[in-house]
Amino acid sequence: VVRLRTLSEPQKMQSAVKMMLEILKNSTFERSNIQRVQSNTQIGQKQLQENPSRLMNIRLYRAIYGQHAYAEPITGTNGSINRIQPAHLQQFRDRFLVAQNMNIAITGKLTLKEAEKLANTISTHIAQGVAATTLPQPTPATRFNIQHIPYRSQQAHVSIAQLATTRDDPDYLALEIANKMLGGSSFNSILMKELRVKRGYTYGVSSTFRFTQAAGLFSLGYSTRQDQLLDSIQVAHQSLIQFVQQPINLEQLKETKAGLIRAFPNQYSSNASINAQLGHIGFYRLPVNYLSDYAERVEKITAEDVQRAIRKHLQPDRLTLVIVSEHLDKAALEKMLQDNLLTPISLTPTLRNMKTTPIDKITLAPMQEVVEPDLVPSDVPALILDNAHNESDVD
């Protein structure tokens, strides 16, 4: 993504656009400049390596995506960043920052005619190039995959995920609604009620769909005490199974849809947010009336639409679990997950038979220097061949 924010006064805007185009066309990527950036990132990378959520996300994406481009973190790792050479940046620029890949979103004090003229200036003053090929679809899992990262702490961190679907899937809106019901940020979500309100396992739990060009992820995550780890996973898994199998709660569906409609205007409350929405529409080739018709399309989603979508796209028997904790009995965990699939769901344990001592604030300390992001042999500079992540917008 290339972003430019400038004053709308014609002379200043023209100078800014001219400078941007000059940089795009003629950057030389001097080795000394690259080395300076690499040096500046080392401290940040070190801090990230000591962050359990960072470790969990890297392991999660690599476990699910394998050799796919999405497997590698967009911020890189020490291993991949230090291997970047000027030729890599030049190759990326020449292959992807070209007119055939361009999606231009413009917001600000411009008429439509002025915006069209500006877009034409940008698109005709850079290399035309060739449009990037479509990303391949990743291979979905066929069974449970449990990954454990040893980490000394009283708290354990849990991420449960699976491949989901793409941004252009017709089920997109139904799945967004389903996700709000299952693991939205409010206390009315199913996971929050089961894990926090009823059992006190965690301060917060959330789920999300990541809709991308190739299949993105459905994931849920939370942290809990080490002694509550297996029980909390059991409840989270049972909640997911029950959500897929049982009829949709009509009252919760009504409240969720109303909440989405009320919150939607906040997504374009400033020039920057409007620009982001326009860029999203262009990049994913959404209909031009996407924003104006949003509320109407949400209202039309029925319980049957949501039920069909989650039964199609959620697979509680093919989950990848990444757990950052001091100890984990993987055999016991897998047996518990398999048992959940075979027996009728009754969410247990309940508040009546468990201790709900609040979780103390924990200072996390690694068992040893954490080098997890650099351990995987496939750790290479992020794949750029056939990678279509190259939208360009001007604010």
Task: Locate each region found by the language model.
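Hydrophobic side chains in well-ordered alpha-helices
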Residues: 16, 115-118, 191, 232, ...
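M16 family metallopeptidases and their MPP-like homologs
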Residues: 1-24, 42, 53-79, 101-107, ...
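An aromatic/glycine/proline-enriched structural segment found at the starts
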Residues: 66-74, 98-99, 103-166, 268, ...
